[in-house]
Design a protein with these regions (language model features):
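NAD(P)-dependent Rossmann-like dehydrogenase/reductase catalytic/cofactor-binding core
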Residues: 78-80, 86-125
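C-terminal substrate-binding/catalytic lobe of Rossmann-fold NAD(P)-dependent oxidoreductases
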Residues: 1-95
Length: 125
């Protein structure tokens, strides 16, 4: 996770600490994420920013016990984000919970996207 984050973001200076845990769920990946931003963001600002990002769905209504859960992500090409809250241990810190269907968002979706690019850019000429 550490190396992948730096590689995907193209920035070796990104500091990541990760712990991986395998739990018995049918499918899906879940992550507890803690970030520190350059400037202070309120949880509401973070929700608004994330809600505009392609492929992200904010599911964050603690009053109604609505949080991202692997079962809710199943069968979707979306990453669900919720439990967005301030991290009081960092000046500009936020915590949130992320879930996704790893079959759709992982290898299967990547394979389809690669095939689409091959067809569009190389096979339809």
């Amino acid at each position: 996770m550490v190396n992948e984050t730096q590689k995907i973001m193209g920035d070796d200076s990104i500091q990541v600490t990760a712990t991986t845990v395998r739990v018995p769920v049918f499918y899906g990946h879940s992550e507890a994420v803690n970030i520190e931003t350059e400037r202070k963001l309120s949880p509401d600002e973070a929700r608004q920013i994330l809600a505009k990002a392609p492929g992200i769905k904010v599911v964050d209504n603690p009053a109604k016990n609505e949080y991202p859960m692997p079962l809710d992500a199943a069968g979707q090409d979306l990453t669900l984000v919720g439990r967005i809250r301030e991290d009081f241990s960092l000046p500009n810190g936020l915590n949130f919970w992320v879930v996704a269907d790893n079959l759709r968002m992982g290898s299967a979706t990547n394979a389809v996207q690669i095939a689409e690019i091959l067809i569009r850019d190389y096979l339809r000429k």
